[in-house]
């Protein structure tokens, strides 16, 4: 079955765990099936999925599990680190499974410049046999995706999309101007309406873990430029509630609070205890559901 990867909404999915830190496969399948029901693409093993806290064997097990479900929505897998050989090994494994596309983040921690970034991304794109979405998230990597990367690689056959999460609308506009054929996704839930105005065509979302149906409608209206000031306030509140402490703590806490996963357990260094007050999530949940009921 051919899968269309140009889904307007991908959910950066959490990885549910039991209290001992082992993966809760039953809860994981339920989350995946929920996303499938609402026709959301799924991103597994991104930062929201705590990929860097899982060892290689666990990551492989996650990919096997998800791809064996034969979901009817596209499956994107995160690629990220600072050891190129390991990333290429990871891609090689994923390509033995039914993975549809990759999310490739700027190298972590090392802050490479334009030439170094270009070399890194070219090596990854050359290895990949699937479409790749580059990922600009300087709040996590310490460096922006260099514009020269897009100038040099925009015609690479495996470069498909860009996830933009710098918070800089003008930077997104420049990326779009440099590579107009690149599909741009907002990587920030609350900024989708603004990024849609400068060329974004979709969202890679954290909050759709919590509100998949409602977020799908929000994406549709944002891309149609139909979001009002009042609508914007609702979704900004929803975004704040899911990022009040380090992601994915709030999402896991809320999913567990609503019995959608068994526990709110995270892998070290993250602890659910960072979020003691659920008032922002409770308020946002009410706002989002009220908004949706009046659409």
Curated annotation (Swiss-Prot):
Swiss-Prot/TrEMBL site (Part of a proton relay during catalysis) positions: 47, 109
One protein family per Pfam: DHDPS
One of the record's GO cellular component terms: cytosol
Catalytic residues (positions): 135 (proton donor/acceptor), 163 (schiff-base intermediate with substrate)
Single biological process term from Gene Ontology: diaminopimelate biosynthetic process
Main EC class the enzyme belongs to: lyase
Matching PROSITE patterns: DHDPS_1, DHDPS_2
Domain of life: Bacteria
Enzyme Commission code: 4.3.3.7
GO molecular function annotations of the record: 4-hydroxy-tetrahydrodipicolinate synthase activity
Catalytic reaction list: L-aspartate 4-semialdehyde + pyruvate = (2S,4S)-4-hydroxy-2,3,4,5-tetrahydrodipicolinate + H2O + H(+)
Pathway linked to the protein: Amino-acid biosynthesis; L-lysine biosynthesis via DAP pathway; (S)-tetrahydrodipicolinate from L-aspartate: step 3/4
UniProt keywords, alphabetically: Amino-acid biosynthesis, Cytoplasm, Diaminopimelate biosynthesis, Lyase, Lysine biosynthesis, Schiff base
Coiled-coil ranges per UniProt: none
Binding site for pyruvate: 48, 204
Places the protein is found: Cytoplasm
Keyword Amino-acid biosynthesis: yes
Subunit and interaction comment: Homotetramer; dimer of dimers.
Similarity field: Belongs to the DapA family.
HAMAP family associated with the record: DapA (MF_00418)
Function: Catalyzes the condensation of (S)-aspartate-beta-semialdehyde [(S)-ASA] and pyruvate to 4-hydroxy-tetrahydrodipicolinate (HTPA).
Protein name: 4-hydroxy-tetrahydrodipicolinate synthase
Gene label: dapA
